[in-house]
Amino acid sequence: MSKKNPWQIFSEECKGVADAYQRLMSEANFGGVLDEKTRLLIMVGIYSTTRDPVALSHFVGEALKAGASKRQIQAAALLPFTVGVSSAELSIPLIKEICDIERR
């Protein structure tokens, strides 16, 4: 299996689409009104809600790189908890695993 994450592979295989997505995300953030860490924490909350482990893993890693703490990421993932426990059941173990790997 490739050591590249799915986004890296997608970006290489579909560069134009990936670039268009990045531009769309920038516009959705009105050119950067949210700082990067905040934006990434929101993405963690979104993908926790949709129970998408691939995207959630990506954004947890990106949030860590942007300076978010494990607790901040967990808090973002738990916000959707009010719409159902299944989002937390997916998110918290995944966050723990990624944070444990990042510490190595």
Residue ranges and their predicted role:
Residues R39-P53:
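Amphipathic, charged-and-aliphatic alpha-helical interface segments
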Residues T49, S57-F59, V85, I98:
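Hydrophobic alpha-helical segments
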Residues R51-A77:
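Mid-chain, well-packed structural core segment of small domains
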Residues R71-C99:
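C-terminal structural segments of small proteins and small subunits
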